C-alpha cells in the first residue's frame, strides 16, 4: 500500500508540475486522476490503521469500571470464553497458572452489574497474581471471571440484575430452590424486582456458565466480590478469614439460590464473599494489595492445609 506524508506530497506536486509542462492535455488529465485516487486511498488506509476504534473488552470496561485505566485492563490479557450473556456479550476469563499448582481458586466479580468496583478489584488482582510473590508458601492456579454480568455493568445506568431481570446471585440450584426462592423473594423482599431469582434455577446463561466453571475447574476455593456492605462473609467448610485488609468477618447468613449457599453449603467448596465498602469506588491501590496478601496467607494456611488438597487435573 502507498502512504503519503507531507514531504512526499510536496515532492509529488513538484513532479506533477513538471509533467504538466511537458505533457499533452490527455496525459495531464490521466495523471491528475491517478494522483487523486492514490491520495484518497492513502487517506482511507491511514484512517483504518490509525483512527479506527479498537475492539476487545477493555474498550468498554476501562470506561465503565472505577480506577481501571486502560493499561490495567490490557495488562490483564483477558481471554474470551465460550460463555455469553443474555445479550450475547462475551464472558471473559483469565487463568494465572504456575508450574505444579497446589490449589485452584476461582475469583468472580460483578455478579451484580451495579457493583462495578467488584470487577475493578478483580482486574487489579490479576496483575498481583501475575507478580506471584516468592514468599507465598502455596502455588495457586487462579481463574478470574472479573465481569460475570456484563449486560448489567454496561446498562445505562448499571443494573444489579441481568438483561432478563434476574438476580444471578439467587439463581443457583440450591436444595429446595423451587420451594424457597420464590417464597423468600415474595415474603422477605416484597417482590423487589432487583432480587427476582428467576423462573427456575440456572435459567440464565451467566449462572449456567459459572456453574459449569465450578464443575470443570473444580476450585478448592471460590472468592465472590460484591459491594457495598464493607464486610467479609463466608460459607462452607474450613475456618473463615477473620479479615482481609480493613474488611472484618461478619457472616450475613445464606439465601436461597445464592452462590455462597450453593458452593459453600451444598457443594462443600469454601466461598469467601467480599463486600467492598463502596460499589462505585475501589479501595486504594495499597488496600487492594493488602487484601490480596491477606487472602494469599489465609488460603495457604487454611485451604492448603486441608487433607487431600493435592493437584488434580482440571
Could you describe each region identified by the protein language model?
Residues 231-235, 241-245, 257-314:
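Active-site-adjacent mobile loop/cap segments within catalytic or ligand-binding domains
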Residues 47-91:
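Short glycine- and acidic-rich boundary segments immediately preceding or forming the N-terminal edge
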Residues 102, 106, 116-251:
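Active-site/substrate-binding loop(s) of hydrolase catalytic cores
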Residues 4-20, 37-40:
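Short, low-complexity, charge-dense intrinsically disordered segments
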Residues 32-46:
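Bacterial N-terminal signal peptides
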Residues 93-101:
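Short beta-strand-to-loop junctions in surface cap/lid or active-site-entrance loops
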Residues 79, 93, 144, 222, ...:
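Conserved beta-strand scaffold positions in the cores of enzyme catalytic domains, especially
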Amino acid at each position: 500500500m502507498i502512504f503519503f506524508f507531507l514531504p512526499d506530497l510536496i515532492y509529488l506536486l513538484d513532479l506533477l508540475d513538471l509533467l504538466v509542462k511537458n505533457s499533452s492535455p490527455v496525459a495531464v488529465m490521466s495523471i491528475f486522476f491517478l494522483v487523486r485516487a492514490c491520495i484518497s486511498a492513502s487517506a482511507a488506509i491511514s484512517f483504518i490503521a490509525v483512527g479506527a476504534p479498537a475492539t476487545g473488552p477493555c474498550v468498554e470496561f476501562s470506561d465503565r469500571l472505577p480506577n481501571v485505566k486502560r493499561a490495567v485492563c490490557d495488562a490483564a490479557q483477558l481471554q474470551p470464553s465460550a460463555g455469553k450473556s443474555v445479550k450475547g456479550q462475551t464472558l471473559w476469563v483469565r487463568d494465572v497458572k504456575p508450574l505444579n499448582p497446589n490449589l485452584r481458586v476461582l475469583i468472580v466479580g460483578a455478579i451484580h452489574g451495579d457493583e462495578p468496583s467488584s470487577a475493578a478489584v478483580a482486574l487489579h488482582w490479576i496483575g498481583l497474581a501475575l507478580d506471584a510473590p516468592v514468599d507465598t508458601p502455596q502455588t495457586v492456579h487462579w481463574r478470574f471471571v472479573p465481569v460475570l454480568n456484563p449486560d448489567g455493568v454496561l446498562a445505562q445506568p448499571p443494573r444489579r440484575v441481568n438483561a432478563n431481570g434476574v438476580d444471578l446471585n439467587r439463581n443457583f440450584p440450591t436444595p429446595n430452590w423451587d420451594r424457597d426462592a420464590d417464597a423468600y423473594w415474595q415474603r422477605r423482599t416484597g417482590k423487589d424486582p432487583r432480587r427476582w431469582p428467576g423462573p427456575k434455577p440456572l435459567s440464565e446463561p451467566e449462572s449456567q456458565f459459572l456453574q459449569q466453571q465450578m464443575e470443570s475447574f473444580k476450585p478448592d476455593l471460590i472468592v465472590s466480590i460484591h459491594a457495598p456492605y464493607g464486610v467479609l462473609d463466608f460459607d462452607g467448610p474450613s475456618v473463615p478469614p477473620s479479615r482481609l485488609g480493613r474488611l472484618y468477618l461478619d457472616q450475613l447468613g445464606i439465601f436461597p439460590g445464592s452462590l455462597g449457599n450453593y458452593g459453600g453449603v451444598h457443594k462443600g467448596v469454601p466461598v469467601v464473599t467480599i463486600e467492598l465498602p463502596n460499589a462505585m469506588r475501589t479501595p486504594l491501590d495499597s488496600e487492594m494489595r493488602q487484601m490480596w496478601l491477606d487472602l494469599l496467607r489465609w488460603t495457604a494456611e487454611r485451604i492448603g492445609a486441608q487433607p487431600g488438597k493435592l493437584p488434580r487435573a482440571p
